[in-house]
């Protein structure tokens, strides 16, 4: 940008920060001087005083300008640059708002038409009811039949059988009909659309999302703004496997140019089944791409059936043929760049072919909206923001590489869940129980996802083994369960099994022959890699700290790493699937690293009612919840809270020919132990009878009563004050309840000189502050909770604590188990003494804490 060659006297007086300058003096810069200053500005927009003096010495043409005037020039230049960027940003926001306003006006017109249709139908229904009331029952029945016949005559089905749909002209006729039906759904009133809860339009929102009501099959519709050109959007969305995680493959079997400049494609699509309880689906469709007269680009698609005519699709022995009704996407260019995108998905998944308990999964427009329609819109927005540079990831990884990792994790997990024969999977003999299915694959190079090739396995004929199971969960929010599995891995995972899985990446892959039950617990550190724009999915690396307690355990002593994908942790998303998928990786973390994914997927099936004000975002106190739970299996929920979800578990391991049976036995036992752990977690999460959110039970074991007595007595002994004030009681149960419900966070940590202090007990407020449970509390170390100033303050006061018995720490900041920062006004630390006056532990009381 060229600067203005002269500045007025008033502007100089107004901009100059130096009151000592002559108010009648101003500087006229020559083009050469401006060029020299611009060169320096490009290298360093804010030069120091020494740099400005050096500039004057190096550039004789600036010798007649005072250093303070050059300082003012750089200030003005930075100001103009900031104004230019702000103006560009405001123009972008203004274009978004104008486009959104146009979109809302069109949506308003569509809704007005829909209201008019409903008013007309209401009047017509009233007329029919009035007419029917004046006739006999038999005549009214006959009138209904006649009315239905008249309606069918007014809306005759097109007679596709009269045309030859096996030639280009016949296919073009089908394509034009599909286009008309799709446009009537995307911008018209062909479907009764109802806006999804929580999906509100705005310049930064995902867009307008609606689902169908009372239509054949299930349907979803979305429209929003994307900052990409229409042809680029079409290119992205046509590549369905890149954004639809349930899409296994898309094969274009024929491409036929249409006479109007469009293109007709015959496409065979295979979809993954989301669980082990139902067969996968496939589609045989015609896809039509063309430009409209207004400059919009449209891609519509529909199934070819015996009713529509057309070529017969490939046979599907392992799939159930589903029907795609006219669907697609309409892309309209925006003034000033970008596009307005309309997406419609309308399918019939043949729900009657699945077990009754699973039918809600195939009959839910909400689930379709989240898995397909919203996923497509989010993917395009993600690409747009990555292209514009709005999204940047650390670690030097390109966004496309990180997206590929996420796709490979999901694809590998889907391959394991489905176990297709053409991928090389075959069932393995059962051990007598049918709760866990084990399949083996001796040719993993066949996998369509190529998440690992033949080089991944040794040349002596090794393979991949998968143990999987599905179970129904009652009243367990998927988001809460996935968050728990992610944050508290030590409560369900076996360190020995993790070590065995990680061993497949090393030079001697089977150095750990078998996992031992109850492997050593390990601390996990979660390192974030990337997060999608809407924060619905996150990619991260998990470091599992290794331990070795004896010489034979040296194989377990090294740290292990997992590449992990977590999604669906937002409890407010309706119909969302929650998933936690991970795979062992080595320290190099290469872009083409082989991945063998395992994990969990929880899909909501239905929700008959939601308890008022219920929130599952509460502490999952497994120990006390299981101890205090008295509900019998199958007991009805008096609150009417009755929603179900299906959990799918799949774990993959490598094996050689000599260890196949032992690995299979280990995998079965491991999956069964995980199922047992999840059942315990589910009991703690599910609402209790009698209240919407029942309070967590206070642990009432003799050890807990003794510890509380020691904590209270030691506090009084050291400080001379009562921990509970004037309301203090001496009975054990009352004292326990007072400590448990204390308003300040009270925590105990171990007092050992040869190991890092870990927390051993906390009251309810302490658990809330650390965002953990009594069981998981023992995995949290004190030094990882306190920040650096807090650790220094504790170290400086530690001699005083040991001598005097207590000390006060100043206000500071600590971290919860989820990484959230917590501020507190003061912390009191005191020694907890046993009855014989020996040291038992340290107690901490954090006063007036809050999340930052």
Swiss-Prot record:
GO molecular function: DNA binding; DNA-binding transcription factor activity; lipid binding
Assembly description: Homodimer. Heterodimer with ZPR3. Interacts with ESR1 and ESR2. Interacts with ZPR3.
GO cellular component: nucleus
Family the entry assigns: Belongs to the HD-ZIP homeobox family. Class III subfamily.
Known DNA-binding region: 22-85
SUPFAM superfamilies, A to Z: Bet v1-like (SSF55961), Homeodomain-like (SSF46689)
Region ZIP domain: start-end pairs: 80-130
GO biological process per UniProt: adaxial/abaxial pattern specification; cell differentiation; determination of bilateral symmetry; integument development; meristem initiation; polarity specification of adaxial/abaxial axis; primary shoot apical meristem specification
Protein known as: Homeobox-leucine zipper protein ATHB-14
Major place of residence: nucleus
TM annotation in the entry: none
Biased composition (Polar residues): 130-148
Triggers of expression: Repressed by miR165 and miR166.
START domain: residues covered: 164-392
Note on domains (UniProt): The ZIP domain (80-130) is necessary and sufficient for the interaction with ZPR3.
Keywords: Coiled coil, Differentiation, DNA-binding, Homeobox, Nucleus, Transcription, Transcription regulation
Subcellular localization, as worded in the UniProt entry: Nucleus
PANTHER family recorded: HOMEOBOX-LEUCINE ZIPPER PROTEIN ATHB-14
Tissue specificity statement from the Swiss-Prot or TrEMBL entry: Expressed in the center of the meristem and on the adaxial side of the leaves.
Species this protein is from: Arabidopsis thaliana (Mouse-ear cress)
Alphabetical list of Gene3D superfamilies matching this protein: 3.30.530.20, Homeodomain-like (1.10.10.60)
């Amino acid at each position: 940008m060229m600067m203005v060659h002269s500045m007025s006297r008033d502007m100089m007086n107004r901009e100059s920060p130096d009151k000592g300058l002559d108010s009648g003096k101003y500087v006229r810069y020559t083009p050469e001087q401006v060029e020299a200053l611009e060169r320096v500005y490009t290298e360093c927009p804010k030069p120091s005083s020494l740099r400005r003096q050096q500039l004057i010495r190096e550039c004789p043409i600036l010798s007649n300008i005072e250093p303070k005037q050059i300082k003012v020039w750089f200030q003005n230049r930075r100001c103009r640059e900031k104004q230019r960027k702000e103006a560009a940003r405001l123009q972008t926001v203004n274009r978004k708002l104008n486009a959104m306003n146009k979109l809302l006006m069109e949506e308003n017109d569509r809704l007005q038409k829909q209201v008019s249709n409903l008013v007309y139908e209401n009047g017509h229904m009233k007329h029919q009811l009035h007419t029917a009331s004046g006739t006999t029952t038999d005549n009214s029945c006959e009138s209904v039949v006649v009315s239905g016949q008249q309606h069918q005559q007014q809306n005759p089905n097109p007679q596709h059988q009269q045309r030859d749909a096996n030639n280009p002209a016949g296919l073009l006729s089908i394509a034009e009909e599909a286009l008309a039906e799709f446009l009537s759904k995307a911008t018209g009133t062909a479907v009764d659309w109802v806006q999804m809860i929580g999906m509100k339009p705005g310049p930064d929102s995902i867009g307008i999302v609606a689902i169908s009501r009372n239509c054949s099959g299930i349907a979803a519709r979305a429209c929003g703004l994307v900052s990409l050109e229409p042809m680029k959007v079409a290119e992205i969305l046509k590549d369905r496997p890149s954004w639809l995680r349930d899409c296994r493959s898309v094969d274009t079997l024929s491409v036929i140019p249409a006479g109007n400049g469009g293109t007709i494609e015959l496409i065979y699509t295979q979809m993954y089944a989301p669980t082990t309880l139902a067969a996968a689906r496939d589609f045989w469709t015609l896809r039509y791409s063309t430009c409209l007269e207004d400059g919009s680009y449209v891609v519509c698609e529909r199934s070819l059936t015996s009713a529509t005519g057309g070529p017969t699709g490939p046979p599907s022995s392992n799939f159930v043929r589903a029907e795609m009704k006219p669907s697609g996407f309409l892309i309209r260019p925006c003034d000033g760049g970008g596009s307005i995108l309309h997406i419609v998905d309308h399918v019939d998944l043949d729900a009657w072919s699945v077990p009754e308990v699973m039918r809600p999964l195939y009959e839910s427009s909400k689930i379709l909206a989240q898995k397909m329609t919203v996923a497509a819109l989010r993917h395009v927005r993600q690409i747009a923001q990555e292209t514009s540079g709005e999204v940047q990831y650390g670690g030097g990884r390109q966004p496309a590489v990180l997206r590929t990792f996420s796709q490979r994790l999901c694809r590998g997990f889907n391959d394991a869940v489905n176990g297709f024969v053409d991928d090389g999977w075959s069932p393995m003999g059962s051990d007598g129980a049918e709760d866990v299915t084990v399949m083996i694959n001796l040719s993993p190079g066949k996998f369509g996802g190529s998440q690992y090739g033949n080089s991944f396995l040794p040349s002596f004929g090794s393979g991949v083994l998968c143990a999987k199971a599905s179970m129904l969960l009652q009243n367990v929010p998927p988001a809460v369960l996935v968050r728990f599995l992610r944050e508290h891995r030590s409560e369900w995972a076996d360190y020995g099994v993790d070590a065995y899985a990680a061993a497949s990446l090393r030079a001697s892959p089977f150095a750990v022959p078998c996992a031992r039950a109850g492997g050593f617990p390990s601390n996990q550190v979660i390192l974030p890699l990337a997060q999608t724009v809407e924060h619905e999915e996150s990619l991260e690396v998990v470091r599992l700290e290794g331990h070795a307690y004896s010489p034979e355990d040296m194989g377990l002593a090294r740290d292990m790493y997992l590449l992990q994908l977590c999604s669906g942790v937002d409890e407010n998303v309706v119909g969302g699937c929650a998933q936690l998928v991970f795979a062992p990786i080595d320290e190099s973390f290469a872009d083409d690293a082989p991945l063998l994914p395992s994990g969990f997927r929880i899909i909501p099936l239905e929700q008959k009612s939601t308890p008022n004000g219920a929130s599952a975002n509460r502490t999952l106190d497994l120990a006390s919840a299981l101890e205090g739970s008295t509900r019998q299996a199958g007991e009805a929920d008096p609150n009417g809270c009755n929603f179900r979800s299906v959990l799918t578990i799949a774990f993959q391991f490598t094996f050689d020919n000599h260890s196949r049976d032992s690995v299979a036995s280990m995998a079965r036992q491991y999956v069964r132990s995980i199922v047992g752990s999840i059942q315990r977690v589910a009991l703690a999460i599910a609402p209790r009878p009698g209240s919407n959110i029942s309070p967590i039970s206070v642990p009432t074991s003799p050890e807990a009563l003794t510890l509380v007595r020691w904590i209270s007595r030691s506090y009084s002994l050291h400080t001379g004050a009562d921990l509970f004030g004037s309301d203090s009681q001496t009975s054990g149960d009352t004292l326990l309840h007072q400590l448990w419900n204390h308003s300040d966070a009270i925590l105990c940590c171990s007092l050992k000189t040869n190991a890092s202090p870990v927390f051993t007990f906390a009251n309810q407020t302490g658990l809330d502050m650390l965002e953990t449970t009594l069981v998981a509390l023992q995995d949290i170390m004190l030094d990882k909770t306190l920040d650096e100033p807090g650790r220094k303050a504790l170290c400086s006061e530690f001699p005083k604590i040991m001598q005097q018995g207590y000390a006060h720490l100043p206000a500071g900041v600590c971290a919860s188990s989820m990484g959230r920062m917590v501020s507190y006004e003061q912390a009191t630390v005191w020694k907890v003494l046993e009855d014989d006056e020996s040291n038992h532990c340290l107690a901490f009381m954090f006063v007036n804490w809050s999340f930052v």
